[in-house]
Amino acid sequence: MPPTLKVVIAGDGNVGKTSLIRRWCEGKFEVSRVMTIGVDFQTKVVSLPDGPVKLSIWDVAGQDRFRSLRSGFYRGSRAVALVYDVTESASLANLARWREEINKTVPHGKYVVVGNKIDLPRTVSVEAAHRFAEGTGASYVETSAATGEGVPEMFEAIARLASHTTR
């Protein structure tokens, strides 16, 4: 039985967190989606060079009204994907706040910055996203939940990060 590693997918509402998880875990993409209330989670086994790991993927609601609930959801996480929407510059700017919020519960957290919705016309440059990721010591990947582009790479990156984090 592979070890289970808790990872968190965080970011503003409507950036596509749930869609990324469903694309990877279920191979589905739904154009209209119901908002996540509080938290949802799924699991999936990932094969890594050191052996398989089972990711327990926590999908955290992005709306501010759930902020008071979120700190409990971060506890015990091995890695975090900070997701923003490449068509919405505020969602990238808000990742600094997300990181600060998570670091209160998970000091020295390990992060992957994810630019989602690359199938749509972007307003956030790749360079700006790279600067943010580098400034926080995070790796950077781009994805499209709609087409599936980059989604396996995103989850492999977070699995590698989680498997090399000791708690």
Language model feature labels by segment:
Residues 1-167:
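TRAFAC-class small GTPase G-domain
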